[in-house]
Amino acid sequence: MSTISKEYGGALFLAAKEEDNASDGYLKQVFDAVMLCSRLFKENPLYVSFLKTPDIPLEDRLAAVHDALNGRVPEYVDNFIELLTERGYIDRFSECADEFKLLYYAENGIAEAEVVSAVPLTDGEVHALRTKLKKITGKRIELLFEIDPSVIGGLIVRVDGRVIDASVRKDLDNLRELMGKTAH
């Protein structure tokens, strides 16, 4: 992550947090809007290209942003997009959003867990996993799922800098390694 993204994402977080002290819930509103805009920019890279195009006058680009957002995001997010556009950093919005998310999660005792499995988990398995990870980390858990058939069975979980590999693939790799050592 670039220094610019850390500075801008951090500044937005601090400003929203300060405003949250005055109006309860504002930080959460800003977080939700930043995540939404980040997802929109990732899914529609033409938006970012449009906002970066120097051939279109800045006023027209900003007017288009204001029209598109039309009061649907908190003022701080609208102003943040405007600032990044004016300074030519709008292509770093997603990185800024990542920094904002890190700070928001730290502030609210949330850990993000990446879960890799061969097949989708059932609701019961998701609940049990979330409960177990909460017990391990002491934090509220946000789960991100990835399906990878090469896992074969079980799970690989990355949370708080730790990797928990309880996959069948790992067991087979360990067995293969053990068999290779005993064959020599």
Question: Each predicted region: which residue ranges?
Answer:
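Elongated, mostly alpha-helical coiled-coil "stalk/stator" tethers of large membrane protein machines
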Residues: 1-184
